[in-house]
Swiss-Prot record:
PROSITE patterns, per database record: EF_TS_2
Name of the protein described by the UniProt record: Elongation factor Ts, mitochondrial
Single GO MF descriptor: translation elongation factor activity
Gene Ontology CC terms: mitochondrion
HAMAP family: EF_Ts
Annotated compartments: Mitochondrion
Keyword Transmembrane helix appears in the UniProt entry: no
Family affiliation: Belongs to the EF-Ts family.
Gene: EFTS
Organism: Arabidopsis thaliana (Mouse-ear cress)
Keywords, alphabetical: Elongation factor, Mitochondrion, Protein biosynthesis, Transit peptide
Length: 395
């Protein structure tokens, strides 16, 4: 702008002196004394002379149009763009300056900058975040949205996106066309899903992938959708969900979901739902790995048996005694990892199998647990602690 002020006056004087001769009419009277017609005079003017004069005029006017607004107006524009985007003030001002203080253009520029920054940060570890749960009559969906810090996980924009994604996850279709059960899905299936957002900072129709990128730009962190699960029930059943460390309904750091199936048309759904809610809470606290001891994987069984046998052999007892020790400890192992064998956290005098049997008697119809799911934010992701030593956390 210093250059503009330096050159504006001499160029303006030149432009004024040339253009005023024509606009005042004096030049035309001089022309009339030398040429019979104005067209003869125009034909005598060197090629490009008129366009040169006109170009100088446009050049001068461009300086006045690019002049920045007053300081008070600048602050108002910065405030408006900051409220619209929640971007850092330095980025807001940089975009406004780049776009000659055009608010709409600066908002588009911020989005472009944000996508570039989000791309650069995508390799950083994102082990914090939130689980979001949505439920309708026949399904429960849970998604995990990750970020780098707990500070961002508590942000209302981040939480709004997580809840919106969970609601849309109810539309995911199982590739196996299964009627009931647990269906896991990842980014490759969900990222191109359409989202219709209605938030002051993120709104309009977009995709899951673009919405995550936009929120990452606003937050200034790596934000990513990691995984999702969909649990469906049969027609005669109940789905119950529990969220631990929940900042608001539908959000939490640990989720437990249980599916109960009842035979026949049972009208005592309230009792079934009560036990279902208690079981979902139990799943979060007790961390079962398998539904029943019959469903413990052969690999897990073999590994545990080998460990228990090695421990028993160190006692120096005979082979028959060792086998009894191993079998006794295996029963303890089942009580730890199999849901139906676990002690009920609300009443440890009974196990889950007894709890469900008592429920069947109460409602007058056989009830069984068909599926359960436990999900925790960041499980299985290597985290860098203060010591910079990676620690693997596996479910």
């Amino acid at each position: 702008m210093a250059f503009a002020r330096a050159v504006r006056r001499p160029i303006g004087v030149f432009y004024y002196s040339v253009s005023s001769r024509f606009s005042s009419g004096n030049e035309y009277s001089t022309v009339a004394s030398k040429f019979e017609t104005l067209s003869q005079y125009k034909s005598s003017v060197p090629s490009g002379y008129t366009s040169l004069v006109r170009g100088f005029g446009n050049f001068i006017r461009s300086f006045s149009s690019e002049a920045p607004p007053a300081v008070s107006d600048q602050m108002s524009l910065i405030k408006q763009l900051r409220e619209r985007t929640s971007a850092p003030i330095k980025d807001v001002k940089a975009s406004l300056v780049e776009c000659n203080w055009d608010l709409e253009a600066a908002q588009k520029d911020l989005r472009k900058r944000g996508k570039v920054l989000a791309s650069k940060k995508s390799s950083r570890t994102a082990a914090e975040g939130m689980l979001a749960v949505a439920q309708n009559e026949g399904k429960v969906a849970v998604i995990e949205l990750n970020c780098e810090t707990d500070f961002v996980a508590r942000n209302e924009i981040f939480q709004y996106l997580a809840l919106a994604m969970a609601k849309h996850a109810l539309l995911v279709e199982s590739s196996s066309q299964q009627v009931s059960g647990v269906f896991p899905f990842g980014p490759e299936l969900f990222e191109e899903f359409k989202l219709n957002l209605d938030h002051p900072k993120v709104n309009g129709e977009t995709t899951v992938s673009n919405a995550v990128t936009e929120v990452a730009a606003i937050m200034g962190e790596n934000v990513k959708f990691r995984r999702g699960f969909l649990m469906s029930k049969s027609s005669a059943g109940v789905l119950s969900a529990y969220l631990h460390t929940s900042p608001q309904p539908g959000l939490g750091r640990i989720a437990g979901i249980v599916s109960l199936e009842v035979e026949g048309e049972n009208t005592q759904l309230e009792a079934i739902q009560r036990v279902g809610s208690e079981l979902a809470m139990h799943v979060v606290a007790a961390k079962p790995l398998f539904l029943s001891k019959d469903l413990v994987s052969s690999e897990a069984m073999a590994n545990e048996r080998e460990i228990l046998k090695s421990q028993a052999e160190s006692t120096g007892k005979n082979q028959m005694a060792i086998e009894k020790i191993v079998e006794g400890r295996l029963r303890k192992y089942f009580e730890e990892v199999a849901l139906m064998e676990q002690k009920f956290i609300v009443n440890d005098a009974i196990n889950i199998k007894t709890l469900v049997d008592n429920l069947s008697k109460e409602v007058g119809s056989p009830v069984k647990v068909t599926d359960f799911l436990r999900v925790e934010v960041g499980e299985g992701i290597e985290r860098l602690e203060a010591s910079d030593e990676p620690v693997a956390q596996t479910a």
